[in-house]
Amino acid sequence: METDALFDAWERAWSGRDPDAFAAVCDPEDVHYEDPLTAAPLESPEAIGAHAGRLWEGFKDARLQKTGPRLVGPDGHAAAPAKLLATHTAELYGLTPTGRFIIVHGVTVAQVRDGRLHRIRMFFDLYDAATQLGVPPRPGTMGEKALLMLRGFGFKREPKP
């Protein structure tokens, strides 16, 4: 499969709510997947499908959309920018549903081998997603300043003369 079509299929797999869809795009014998929510690498299309299933449980309308051109290197590595659009409608990782709609930008970096994704890393800002869900205080608010003070970062201090 050509790389652009492969990433289109990858995005459809994340958007389609069919955990078996990852088998068509991932190397069935030797896949390695990581993102900020995986505690350890996932090493089968079935494991990636189960991981996506947890996302679909909490965000029933989750969809991944292309946001720019895919970059393909001569060595089989490729990158695909995308955004996740979703509404938090059910419990996920212990977080009760907020009903909030989020947009999380990210990029998938992968090694393509024999027309399939082999080594895959999805990068996205987990803190931004949590902020959109209302978990931590929004940047620049008094809540954030109070939290930073409690964590020991405090306000800027004037240097001693």
Can you annotate each of these PLM segments?
Residues 1-161:
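C-terminal and inter-domain tail/linker signature
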